[in-house]
């Protein structure tokens, strides 16, 4: 389990996000840039929808045969001299990782970006063991230095910070003395991290795709930090969600093309690294010992259900980058490691409805996420399924909602009441109307109009408009 992050009630987190004007501006700007780059990169292929269909087919086939490919992966990793551990829960994964680290008497660990290790709270488990865990992805490193600020985006974890804020963090925590120029900040971070690579006992990575036919893992990065994490420490541990697997390199090539274009609008990232087991005789770098931890943590419960398509996700965040709700509330409002539309679908499945039942309602159901997804996950439909499940689980709707729906039903079913309502509505709301917008709504409308305007009813009814123009 281990996923819970939420701090405060959902509506409190949302209100905080909405009133964070810098964050909203940063998110809006990033969404526009990433969306534009994604569309341009997709257009270069010329047949993007065919690529999406192929990506969907690959992911569906893999999930339908997941047990076979996981066994094939395990066998091939072991043939190459690696160790494989299947973890049913977050606790089992952390226990195994801690045992490996303790057996090496390791005290310093370098780590590349990994969502699944965030999901299982691996860093906290290792720190309890007395280890120092250093994030080497620049965004994650910034957040770690800033008192473990949680990530706000799947691909760009420090999206909610600007260069001045990062400069201040570095000045306070890393004795930084230069300006807020990104180049200078990056150089300082690189200098701080370089020594950590050289003195680390263990390297830990995530996994973009594991290749079943060879027992390889693939890491897709732009910074090169993952290469150093895997090349220098004597022991490497890779942690992957059980669904992050492809049958062969042929499928991997397709999904990497979709991933890089959808995530950051690039044909390819700067580094695409394929690692197969520990260092072999004659090789000059790489780990002496390799461990692959395959994490379930609720994923097997999703298989075979109507929510199975969510496991097709390749963690590109294209859905996040087009979501209008994310644009206004930011990633921290979700209170989960996984934000945006994919987080709203995945979090209740992995962490339970008790902690994440509000997230499926953090959506306009505009389907922009579904349209952007490179593997065609029907995200807006899955959000609706969540809502249905929540209503059935709760057993009843709030009394206020029941009364409102009943009143609307009575009015809509009666032509007399409907005519009367449409006639008096403009007059009834007139005291609350300014420039054809209700800015201070009465009763249940107040919660809406406190943060956004509500369109006022038209003064002229459609029936009257049509009657006047019927003879034209």
Curated annotation (Swiss-Prot):
Q: Which UniProt keywords apply?
A: 4Fe-4S, Electron transport, Iron, Iron-sulfur, Metal-binding, Repeat, Transport
Q: Could you tell me the Gene Ontology terms of the biological process aspect for this record?
A: lactate metabolic process
Q: Where is the 4Fe-4S ferredoxin-type domain?
A: 304-334, 353-382
Residues that, per the record, bind [4Fe-4S] cluster 1: 313, 316, 319, 373
Question: Which family does the record claim for this protein?
Answer: Belongs to the LutB/YkgF family.
Question: Which PANTHER family has this protein been placed in?
Answer: LACTATE UTILIZATION PROTEIN B
The job of this chain, per UniProt, is described as: Is involved in L-lactate degradation and allows cells to grow with lactate as the sole carbon source. Has probably a role as an electron transporter during oxidation of L-lactate.
Q: What is this protein called?
A: Lactate utilization protein B
Q: Which organism is it from?
A: Anoxybacillus flavithermus (strain DSM 21510 / WK1)
Name of the gene: lutB
């Amino acid at each position: 389990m281990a996923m819970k992050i939420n701090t405060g009630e959902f509506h409190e987190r949302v209100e905080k996000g909405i009133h964070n004007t810098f964050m909203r501006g940063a998110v809006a700007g990033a969404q526009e840039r990433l969306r534009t780059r994604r569309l341009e990169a997709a257009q270069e292929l010329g047949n993007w929808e065919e690529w999406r269909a192929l990506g969907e087919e690959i992911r569906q086939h893999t999930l339908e045969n997941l047990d076979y490919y996981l066994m094939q992966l395990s066998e091939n990793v072991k043939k190459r001299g690696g160790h494989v551990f299947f973890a049913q829960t977050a606790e089992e994964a952390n226990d195994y990782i801690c045992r490996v680290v303790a057996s090496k008497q390791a005290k310093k660990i370098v780590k590349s970006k990994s969502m699944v290790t965030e999901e299982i709270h691996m860093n906290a488990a290792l720190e309890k063991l007395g280890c120092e865990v250093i994030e080497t992805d620049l965004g994650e490193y910034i957040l770690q230095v800033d008192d473990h600020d949680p990530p706000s985006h799947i691909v760009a974890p420090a999206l909610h910070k600007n260069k001045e804020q990062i400069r201040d963090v570095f000045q306070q925590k890393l004795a930084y003395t230069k300006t807020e120029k990104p180049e200078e900040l990056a150089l300082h971070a690189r200098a701080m991290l370089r020594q950590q690579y050289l003195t680390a006992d263990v390297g830990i990575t995530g996994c973009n795709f594991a290749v079943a036919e060879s027992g390889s893992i693939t890491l897709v990065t732009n910074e090169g930090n993952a290469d150093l994490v895997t090349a220098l420490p004597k022991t490497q541990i890779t942690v992957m969600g059980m669904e992050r697997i492809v049958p062969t390199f042929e499928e991997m090539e397709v999904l990497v093309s979709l991933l890089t274009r959808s995530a950051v609008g690039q044909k390819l990232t700067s580094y695409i690294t394929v690692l197969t087991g520990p260092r072999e005789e004659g090789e000059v770098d790489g780990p002496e010992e390799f461990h692959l931890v395959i994490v379930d943590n609720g994923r097997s419960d999703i298989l075979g259900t109507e929510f199975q398509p969510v496991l097709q996700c390749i963690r590109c965040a294209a859905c996040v980058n087009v979501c209008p709700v994310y644009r206004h509330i930011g990633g921290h409002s979700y209170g989960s490691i996984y934000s945006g539309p994919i987080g709203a679908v995945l979090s209740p499945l992995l962490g339970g409805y008790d902690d994440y039942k509000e997230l499926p309602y953090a959506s306009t159901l505009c389907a922009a996420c579904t349209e952007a997804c490179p593997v065609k996950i029907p995200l807006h439909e899955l959000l609706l399924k969540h809502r249905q499940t929540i209503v059935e689980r709760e057993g009843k709707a709030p009394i206020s909602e029941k009364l409102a729906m009943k009143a609307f039903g009575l009015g809509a079913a009666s032509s007399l009441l409907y005519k009367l309502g449409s006639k008096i509505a403009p007059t009834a709301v007139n005291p609350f109307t300014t420039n054809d917008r209700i800015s201070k709504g009465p009763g249940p409308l107040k919660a809406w109009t406190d943060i956004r305007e509500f369109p006022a009813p038209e003064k002229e009814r459609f029936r009257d408009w049509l009657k006047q123009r019927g003879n034209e």
